[in-house]
Amino acid sequence: MSAPPTNQPPPLPPRSFDNQMSNPMINTGFGYGGGYGMNTFPGSGMYGGGGMYGGGMGYGGFGGGFNHMGYGQGPDSNFARLAEEQSRGAFQSIESVVNAVSSVANMLNSTHNAVYSSFRAVIGVVEQFGRLKTQLSSVVVSLAVFRWVYRFWRWLLVMLKLKPASYASAAEMAWGTSQPYATDVLGATRTPASVNWPAALFWVVAIGGPWLIYRCVSQMVQAAEEKRKWATGAAPHYTAQALFDFQASNEQELSFMNGETLRVAPKEEQPRVRGWLLASVADGSRIGLVPINYVRIVGKQSQSPPLTQQSNLDTFVNAFPARDLNSNIQ
C-alpha cells in the first residue's frame, strides 16, 4: 500500500471522545465495524481477514471514552495522572465507607452518651441508697437500747449453748461490730485487670486502616504501571510510523511529526474510540490518541528494547567519580 501524499493529509476521524470525558481513561475491548480500515499490518488476520488490522474491518463501533484528565503531553504528569485515574473509583468507595463509618460512629457516640448518662443516674441513686443505709445503721447502733438488746441476744445464745462462752465477751462484740466496716474500707481481694478491648480495637483501626489503604493504592498503581509497559517497550506492542504531521487539539490526543516512530498499544489496552489508536512516543514519555489514518503499522514487537534511561544507582555512581570516592576514603 502506497502512502498518501504528504501535502494533503486525510480528514481526521470524528472526535467522539470529546463528549465522553467521564468514562475511564482506558476502556479495554474492541468493537468491529466499518470505518477507517487499514490493511497495512503484516501477518495473519488479527483484527480482520487478511490483515492484522485490515480486511475492511478497521476500528468501528467504539463507544468508550476518556475522563476529564485524559492523556497529557507532559512527561512528568503521566504517572500522577495514571495513578489518579486508576485509584479514583477506589477512593470514592473508600470515601463512601468513611462516611458510613462516620455516621455509625456519630450514632454510637450519641448512644454512648445516653447510656452513660442513664448509668450515672442509676449509680447516683444506688449511692444515695447506700449512704442512707449507712446513716440509718449508725443511728440504730448509736441507740443504747438497741445495744443492750444486742448484748442480751448474744448472752442468750451463749446460755442456750448455741455459741461459745467468748461470744458474749466485750472483745468479741467489739470485733464483730468493727469487722463489717473494716471489710468495706479495705475491700475484698482485687481481681486481675482485664484487657481494654475498645482501646485495642481503636489502635488497630487507627494504624491498620492507613496501612491497608496504602497497600491497596500501591497495588492499583502497580497494576496501572503493568498495563502501560507497552509504552516503554517492556511489553508486547505494535510499531507505527507517522505519515503526516498531527497537532493535538486537546489533552487526550498525542502530537507527532511526519516520519516519527510511535508505539501502538496492544488490542486489550486499546480504548473504544472509533477511528483512533492509543499510542505513545518512542521513549514512552507521552501517551495519547492518534488518528488511525495518519499512521502506518510497521510490525509487532514482543521484546523489550535496551533501556534509554539510567537507573538510580547509575545516576548516583556517575555523580561521584571513582577518584573522588577514593580521595574521600583516604
From Swiss-Prot:
The chain crosses the membrane at residues 193-213. GO terms for cellular component: peroxisomal importomer complex; peroxisomal membrane. It is a single-pass membrane protein. One of its GO terms (biological process) is nematode larval development. The keyword Disulfide bond does not apply. Keywords: Membrane, Peroxisome, Protein transport, SH3 domain, Translocation, Transmembrane, Transmembrane helix, Transport. Residues 1-14 have a biased composition (Pro residues). PANTHER family: PEROXISOMAL MEMBRANE PROTEIN PEX13 (PTHR19332:SF1). Component of the PEX13-PEX14 docking complex, a translocon channel that specifically mediates the import of peroxisomal cargo proteins bound to PEX5/prx-5 receptor. The PEX13-PEX14 docking complex forms a large import pore which can be opened to a diameter of about 9 nm. Mechanistically, PEX5/prx-5 receptor along with cargo proteins associates with the PEX14/prx-14 subunit of the PEX13-PEX14 docking complex in the cytosol, leading to the insertion of the receptor into the organelle membrane with the concomitant translocation of the cargo into the peroxisome matrix. Belongs to the peroxin-13 family. This is Peroxisomal membrane protein PEX13. It comes from Caenorhabditis elegans.
